[in-house]
Amino acid sequence: AAGEVVERPASVIKELVENSIDAGAKNITVEIKNGGTTFMRVTDDGCGIYRDDIKVAFLRHATSKVKVESDLDSISTLGFRGEALASICAVSRLQLITRNVNEEIGTSYEIDGGEEQSFDDAGCPVGTTFVIRDLFYNIPARAKFLKKDVSDFCILFGFWKRFCERTYSG
């Protein structure tokens, strides 16, 4: 279920930032509005996603990190289960804008509640931008819970603090 990976805006940000790091990003920008319930954007300058791989990336258990079973013994990336993107797009209105380093033109892909809306060419730099709108719009009970929860900004801040300490210490 989508709730396994996506519990709140902070979990969306965590998953997308980890994807950015795994893509070799040197710069990652995170923007949120209303604690992330109405708008989140994560932009990176990583390698981008190949156009041919975009739709597959949103399928449950799809991952670019495991090619053969023995890869599971040597995973050095932050994410590998292939759950995050499928879960995020199932409970939000998602737009992906990406260009792989080996491609001349980028791609914009929009999904609304797990349903594809558009797949078009896009002029964009190498890297990836995820725009997440209306988190849990199609799960009213979860959306209502989040509207009452004013602590998500603190959770996001705590995630960033722990992440930076883990990544940049020593």
Regions found by a protein language model. Name each.
Residues A1-G170:
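N-terminal phosphate-binding caps/lids of nucleotide- and nucleic-acid-binding domains
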